[in-house]
Regions:
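Bacterial N-terminal signal peptides that target proteins for export
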Residues: 2-18
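Short loop/turn and low-complexity linker motifs enriched in small/turn-promoting residues
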Residues: 30-153, 163-188
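C-terminal motif of bacterial Sec signal peptides marking the signal peptidase cleavage site
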Residues: 25-28
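Generic hydrophobic-segment detector
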Residues: 18-20, 149
Length: 188
C-alpha cells in the first residue's frame, strides 16, 4: 500500500530532494516515456546561455532550503529532452553549492529584493521565446521531510531583467514569484 508523500519521503532532507525531483518528473507536464526516455546526462545538464540574438537576463533565487532551479527553453512545461534545458542553481540545507551550475554567478542582473539569505544564479535567456523556470525544493521540520515543486512559464522581453524567487509559504507549500525589474531596481 502506498504511504502518504510526507511518510514516503521521511528520512534525510537529501531523500526529500530526490523525492521532490522524482515528483517533478512525474508532474502533469510529463509522461512515463518522457521521464525514462531521457538520459541521466540530460537531467544533470548545466544550462548554457544562448549565443547571439536578443536576450534577457534572469536571476533564479531560493531562500534557505535545499533546492534546484532549472530552465526549460521553448517549453511551457519541464521537458528533460529539450537539449537547451539545464540546471541554473542549487543549494543543500540552505547552503549554496558554489561552482555547481551557475550558483553564485553574477551578470549584474537587477534584483527584486535584497540578496541576503538567498542562493542565486544568473543566466541569459533568449528573448521572445517561451521558457519555463522550475524549482524542486526540500525541507524538514524535524519530524517530517517535505518536498515541493513549483514553476512558472513566461516569454522574456529583450534587455529586461527578471528575478525568480522560490520560497516556502507555510510548512508544506512553496511558491515562485517572478519579477520584471526596472533600471531603478523596482519590480514591475
Amino acid at each position: 500500500m502506498m504511504k502518504p508523500i510526507e511518510a514516503a519521503l521521511s528520512g534525510s532532507p537529501l531523500r526529500a530532494l530526490l523525492g521532490a525531483t522524482l515528483l517533478m518528473a512525474l508532474a502533469s507536464c510529463s509522461s512515463v516515456p518522457n521521464i525514462f526516455g531521457a538520459k541521466t546526462a540530460a537531467m544533470t545538464r548545466v544550462y548554457v546561455d544562448p549565443q547571439g540574438g536578443e536576450r534577457a537576463q534572469l536571476r533564479m533565487s531560493v531562500d534557505g532550503s535545499g533546492a534546484n532551479g532549472r530552465v526549460y527553453p521553448a517549453n511551457s512545461c519541464p521537458r528533460w529532452q529539450e537539449p537547451r534545458s539545464g540546471w541554473v542553481m542549487t543549494s543543500v540545507f540552505g547552503i549554496p553549492l558554489f561552482g555547481t551550475a551557475h550558483t553564485g554567478r553574477s551578470l549584474g542582473t537587477r534584483s527584486a529584493m535584497e540578496a541576503k539569505g538567498l542562493t542565486s544564479g544568473e543566466v541569459y535567456l533568449r528573448a521572445n521565446e517561451l521558457v519555463t523556470l522550475a524549482y524542486d525544493m526540500g525541507t524538514s521540520d524535524g519530524h517530517y521531510n517535505y518536498g515541493c515543486l513549483a514553476g512558472v512559464a513566461f516569454t522574456p522581453v529583450a534587455n529586461h531583467h527578471y528575478h525568480a524567487i522560490a520560497r516556502w509559504v507555510g510548512r508544506q507549500q512553496c511558491a515562485v514569484m517572478l519579477f520584471d525589474v526596472d533600471e531603478q531596481g523596482v519590480a514591475k
